[in-house]
Each structure stands twice: as C-alpha cells, then as structure tokens.
Design a protein with these regions (language model features):
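Long, well-structured alpha-helical subdomains associated
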Residues: 15, 459-554
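Post-HEXXH active-site segment of zinc metalloproteases
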Residues: 431-451
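Short, glycine/acidic-rich hinge or "gate" loops at secondary-structure transitions
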Residues: 238-244, 259-262, 437-439, 467-483
Length: 570
C-alpha cells in the first residue's frame, strides 16, 4: 500500500474493490464523473494562494526539462519541494498551514529557469523569465511573505494575515460587515452567503467575483460542466439525473439558491448505487469559515459494509434522546440521517491527496433539519490506512504497555471505524440551533467547535452498552482501544505534523487537541489520564476509562450547537 515517503508524508495506494460488479452503464457514469472531478484541480491550487499555480508550473517546467545534473542536492531538494506542493495543493502545509521552506538555493532555481525555453514557463503577457523570478521568488523564499495559508490567531486580522486567495484588498472587518449586512435573522432558509465567490475591493468598492461559467474559474468550470452533461445522459435514474442537471444549472448561474435546490435533491437521492460530490463544499480553508474550497469525490455503495451504518442510523433517535446535552438542544425528531459505507473511485480537489475518511453533507443547518443529511464512511481509504499501519512499529513505540497494545490490535480498526460512523452519521447530524441563533456566530471558531462536537458525540457513544446490544462491538472492553488511541493522538502523536514553535491551525487537529487537553486537565486531580515518563520517553496512561467517558460527556455540553458562546469557544 505504501508508495513512497518524503518530508513528513507517506503516499499510499488504495484499491477500488467491486468496481467490476457495476454494470457497463454504471461504469460509464463513474468515468464521466471522474473526468469532471479531474478538471477542478487548478481551482483549488488558486484558492489556496494566488501564486500557487504559477509556482507549480514553473517548478514542473524545471523538473521536466532541466538539462543539468539531476543528482545534485539542489535538484533533489527541489523535487521534494515540488512533491510537497503537489501534495498540499500549494506552497503551504495542508495541516500546519505554514509555508514550506525550500532546501535548495535561489541561485540554482534562477539559473535553471533562465536556461529554459521561455515558451515552457508560465509567463504573464510581456513578462521575461528574469521578471518571473523577481515576482515569484520572494513568495517562495522570503519567510515573511504569505507565511500562513490560514491564520486563526486571536486578535489579528485573519483575512490580511492569511495567504489564501478568497479575499483581495479587503480587511476582516470589511468582509464580516459585507456578509453581516446580507443576513436576515428572520430568514429560516438562508443561502450560504459568500460560499462561491472571491471578495475583492476594486476602485474602492467591495464586490463579489463569482466562480461560475463566464465568471472566475470559467475555463475549468466549463470543462466540469461538459463532463457532467455526459454523466447526466447515463444517470442511473430520474432522481440522479435531476441532481446532476441542477448542479450544472448552479455552475452556469452561480446562484446559491440553485445550490440549495441541488443539495436538497442530492440528499433525497438514496436509491442510486453511485454517488458523487462536485463543487464548492467545505469552508475550512477560509479563516472566516465563509468561502468554500472546490472538491470532488466519486463513489459507489459498499453494500456489505453499509449494514453497520444502517444499524446506527436506524437508531439515530435513541442516540439523540440519550445524549447528555440539555433537552432544549436536542432534535425532537431526527430527520433522515442516511448513512452508508462507500468505495471511493476517485478523490479530487480538497479531498486529494490528504482525504477525509468520513463526510457528512450538506452543511446548511436548515437543509439538514428539514431534509436530512447524507453521511458516509470511505471504506477503501480506511482499509488502506489500516493495512499500511499494521506492523509499522508505531504502536510498539508509543503505546504504554502490552495490555493497551493487545486491545488496540484486537479492536482498534473496528472501534476506529465505528467512531467515524458515529461522528459523521450522528455527531454532525445531532443537536439543533435555537431559533434566532446565527449559525456563523462562532466565526473563526465555528469549524473547530463543530468538529469537536461530532467527535465527542462519537466518543461518548462508542463506549455505550447500546453498541454491545446492537452487536456493533463484541464486548464492553472494545471502546478502550478508541479512547486510548484518540487521547494519545490528541495529546501527543498528531503533533509530529506541526513544526516546533508553531500553533495547531487545522480545525480537525485543533478539535482533537481541545478534547484530549480538556480530559487531561479536568481529570488531573484524580489522575484520570497522565503523561508518564519511562526510559526517558513520554507516554499517555489512562487510569480510569469510565471517568474519561464522563469527561467526554461534560465537554460535549460545552460544544452543543446552542447558544453559540464565542468566549467559551475561544
């Protein structure tokens, strides 16, 4: 499963089992949707930073056409840098958000660029190779320029200090005021304002540049639409055909009302074996959590494994009723939480190559409340992770003792998958906003708190006797494997992705740290969880698993979707 390793990355392969069981028409549909997915790659690069595409193309030209000695450390280090750019869809780390530091000299790159045929370089009109270097080198080599893709540091202007390309010439205050003025507190079905546009200031006037056919990114979007039209012609049924048709309409109009109509049609299509996401979806890449990055996933249902998630979703009301949060924050009637295990046929955009293993959509609160949501666990990706991790020495190195290791070996894969199922299927779908509460009230903290809420819901229930009763886990000990690995990862091992001295910026990583630290600190008087030194190494030790579950429940109370307390979240 492992292809290669460089920097802090390991590249894995994944299998696409059961593809051959699809009908010829279904395979054709997967092919067209896959082509549509491939066309959006450059959108994401540009969203992540305005110079990313030109830096990538300049480096690709050198990588492909360099005539000098390729065995030098300069060339080899440039190759690693380029691979990191490919992996992170830009010049910033996909988790840490900090800019990559090139381990090759400016002189080397400049000589290489100036020695190239100018037609191979991404030159602007009338630009020389020398001017290209003058424009792009400071962005690459000066640590003070565009140092962070998404900055979440409290008290700073998050828009001006973030290198992502969602705003141009606009301050955080201006952006928040612009979208604040659009919102009507009485509107119970609001569109996701600002989701599919760049906010710019031109001639002193703030305006949106919409991503659509004829707007920004039209070259890529026209190609996406071309393949979607082909997919529409081989749809499995009328419902799916309507979904694809409405998505095409959204790409052509850029209207967020069309986007909501598409999302409602999509969430109601439960009969198709093949499903897909294609478009501006998640807002983690915007420090204000407003604008969505482009992503795509084409998949088909894993019929056998879906049985597990169907048991969970059919008991969704029981889980909602028995959660430890206040009754006023619970849904009286849980609407259509559909859950399935899927096989990914392709990952693209912001889902590639570092991908989610579980997804719950749509994101609009009112659509979830009125029409339900779709929750998926990506089975073949989880399987690749599990297969690559077995026997790599990680647990032998970091897990405190043999008893914990044996438990993780025995139950870890199963409880990990169950936690993902519970996180997506019930966690994101649980709870409700009280009337009049702005879903964006938590601003920059919204993404992290929402992820924490979903994780805590899953953690709280993975230890519930109900799971033994439903035959989802073999016994009452299994949950301890997930608790141990979650706490070890949150407190310690996930930090391998962060450079010393830097802060954790990515929402999912922040949430894991938040939960693990909460349990560690709140449980400290009773030594519920400890960090213990043994032979000069630090280990996580869990002394009281039942108390850990209680603390997860307490933390869940603080992250429930109402009343949206920003100082508490901070």
């Amino acid at each position: 499963y492992t292809v290669e390793q460089f920097a802090d990355l390991q590249i894995l392969r994944y299998k696409v089992p059961e593809f051959e069981t699809l009908t010829l028409k279904q395979k054709e549909l997967v092919y067209y949707l896959t082509q549509a997915a491939l066309e959006g790659r450059d959108i994401l690069f540009d969203q992540n930073g305005k110079y990313n595409l030109r830096i990538r193309r300049m480096l690709e030209a050198v990588y492909t056409h360099y005539q000098g000695d390729k065995s030098t450390s300069d060339f080899k280090n440039m190759e690693v840098y380029l691979k990191r750019v490919w992996f992170s869809n830009g010049i910033h780390h996909h988790y840490g958000m900090e800019k990559f530091v090139p381990d090759f000299s400016q002189d080397f790159l400049k000589k290489a660029v100036l020695g190239m045929d100018a037609q191979l370089l991404p030159l602007a009109e009338g630009q020389t190779a020398e001017q290209l270097c003058d424009e792009l080198f400071p962005v690459m080599f000066d640590p003070a320029i565009m140092s962070k893709r998404v900055n979440q540091a409290d008290g700073e202007d998050l828009v001006l200090t973030s290198a992502c390309n969602y705003y141009d010439g606009v301050t955080q205050q201006e952006a928040e005021s612009f979208y604040g003025a659009m919102k009507d507190p009485k509107d119970e079905t609001p569109v996701s304002y600002g989701l599919n546009s760049r906010l710019v200031k031109e001639d002193g006037k703030i305006q949106e540049k919409v991503w659509k056919v004829g707007g920004l990114y039209t070259q890529a979007i026209e190609k996406i639409v071309y393949w979607l039209k082909k997919a529409e012609s081989v749809a499995e049924n009328d419902a799916q055909k309507a979904v694809i048709g409405k998505l095409i309409q959204f790409y052509e109009t850029g209207s967020l009302k069309d986007f909501d109509e598409y999302a409602i049609l999509w969430v109601k299509d439960l009969d198709s074996r093949i499903d897909f996401v294609n478009g501006f979806t998640e807002s983690y890449g915007d420090p204000l959590g407003v604008k969505a990055s482009w992503e795509s996933l084409v998949n088909f249902k894993d019929l056998e494994a879906t049985h597990r998630t169907e048991i969970i979703s059919s008991n969704a009301q029981w889980f909602e009723d028995h959660s430890p949060v206040d009754k006023s924050f619970k849904k009286e009637k849980v609407k259509g939480v559909s859950a399935k295990v899927i096989t990914a046929a392709i990952l693209a955009g912001d889902l590639y190559p570092a991908t989610a293993i579980g997804i719950n959509l749509p994101n609009a609160n009112w659509i979830r409340a009125h029409h339900g949501s779709k929750s998926v666990t990506i089975g073949n990706i989880t399987d690749a992770y599990n297969k690559a991790a077995h026997g790599n020495g990680f647990n032998e190195e970091f897990v405190y003792n043999d008893e914990e290791r044996q438990r993780i070996d025995q139950y870890g894969d199963l409880t990990g998958e169950l936690h993902t199922d519970l996180h997506e299927c019930l966690g994101h779908g649980s709870g409700k906003l009280l009337p009049g509460v702005d879903p964006d009230a938590l601003k920059a903290y919204g993404s992290t708190i929402e992820e924490a809420r979903a994780d805590l819901f899953g953690l709280y229930y993975v230890a519930d006797p109900k799971l033994v009763e439903l035959k989802l886990v073999p016994d009452a000990e299994a949950y301890k494997a997930e608790y141990y690995t979650f706490l070890m990862n949150g407190l310690m091992t996930q930090l391998v992705r962060i450079e010393p001295g830097n802060n954790i910026e990515e929402a999912h990583m922040r949430n894991r740290q938040l939960i693990a630290r909460w349990v560690f600190e709140k449980g400290a008087p009773d030594k519920v969880v400890e960090m213990v030194k043994k032979d000069g190494k630090t280990y996580v030790v869990v002394n009281d698993y039942e108390k850990v579950r209680e603390l997860f429940g307490d933390c869940l109370l603080y992250t429930s979707p109402s009343p949206r307390d920003i100082s508490g979240s901070r």
